[in-house]
Amino acid sequence: MTGCTTPGDALLSFEPLEEGVLIKRYKRFLADVELSSGEVITAHCANTGPMTGVLIPGQRVRLRHAPSPKRKLAWTWEQAEVPGADGAPCWVGINTALPNRLIRATIEAGCLAAQLGPIASIRAEVAYGANKRSRIDLLLTPTDSNPDQRPIYLEVKNTTWTDGTTALFPDTVTERGQKHLVELMGVLPDSRAVLVPCLSRPDVTEFAPGDSADPRYGELFREAIKAGVEVLPCRFRFQADGIRWEGIRPLKQL
């Protein structure tokens, strides 16, 4: 753990992404994009949701180019530019395969040490819940020096929908998300349960459940908090060559 305390610290760095303009998204997993060279390509869209508020044909997008014999498509759509809460352009991370890796890097950098305490190990996709039929995103084992020796079950949710400066999850009905809340409550009190909304845009100042999209999720969210589930909304800034830590944001008063 290196001790990540300064907002703006780079957590992930990568080769600069290629920029283009979105033509259309279709069949959920596909997006046609015109690159800056004028070439039109089809990219993989690693986001199964409706992408409410961040899907705008004609918007600027950023893509990762990773050709491989094992991949049907050489391009992956990573980021989208949208009008931010203040009207200025804002880049949003739309690849839902990334947040688990990003939150793991956040923990390993020590950015959540004050909230989680010292962590000895991190395991991903560990079976848990009823009949071990679900998998927790991250299972953390505290060090011997951690004041709370309970294992930490941590669920990550990519969050891109907003209402003004409030980040909202979910943006559609999610029975899977409802189930995750129930299962997080199920590990209490012998373990800690932590929900981490990954706020994948820098223009938000707080987090709240997306009640208008999924009222049942909102009800379960409130039950989970009362039961002892911890919520740590983590905000990030997405750039062409990396992702930067911007700190924890508060939960909106419910």
Curated annotation (Swiss-Prot):
Disulfide bonds: none annotated. GO terms for molecular function: DNA binding. CDD domains: SfsA-like_bacterial. HAMAP family: SfsA. Belongs to the SfsA family. This is Sugar fermentation stimulation protein homolog. It comes from Parasynechococcus marenigrum (strain WH8102). The gene is sfsA.
